[in-house]
Design a protein with these regions (language model features):
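Active-site-adjacent loop/helix surface patches within enzyme catalytic domains
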Residues: 2-134
Length: 136
């Protein structure tokens, strides 16, 4: 199967969070891609929280309102997005997943629809990650 090549329009910048486990994991450990929305009033506040060491929360990727993507934690490390979690036989999903936060004010803060640009950017990133890590 040929590898998916991200579209040129997929802009990824680096802004690393200090919040991750320093133990490297191998590609085959990654079984899931988990999506979240930020649930915060502003994009800046969401990014600041993900970069704040005291918040103890992070993600691998953050999708901005304008559809730009920020890589916050390399996939080879566990970000802190799933907390104490379980799904089927898997526990502590951070160790087996890639976490993607999509900027959205959420249901507590006047929920807004995701833009078509955000959806397109998310789909491109998802296709790339599914191929790269053989996630089904």
């Amino acid at each position: 199967m040929p590898k998916f090549k991200p579209k040129i329009s997929m802009k990824i910048t680096l802004n690393y969070s200090p919040n991750f486990d320093p133990f490297k994991r191998i590609k085959k450990q990654i079984k899931f891609i988990i999506f979240h929305y930020t649930g915060m009033k502003s994009e800046k506040k969401a990014i600041d929280k993900l970069l704040n060491q005291n918040s103890k929360v992070s993600c691998h990727y953050f999708i901005k309102n304008n559809a730009d993507i920020i890589k916050m934690v390399p996939e080879t490390y566990q970000s802190w997005h799933a907390g104490i979690s379980k799904w089927k036989k898997f526990k502590f999903l951070n160790k087996n997943s890639i976490g993607i936060e999509i900027q959205n004010s959420g249901h507590d803060n006047k929920y807004e629809n995701f833009s078509q640009k955000q959806i397109s950017s998310t789909k491109n990133l998802l296709k790339y990650l599914m191929n790269e890590y053989r996630v089904k």
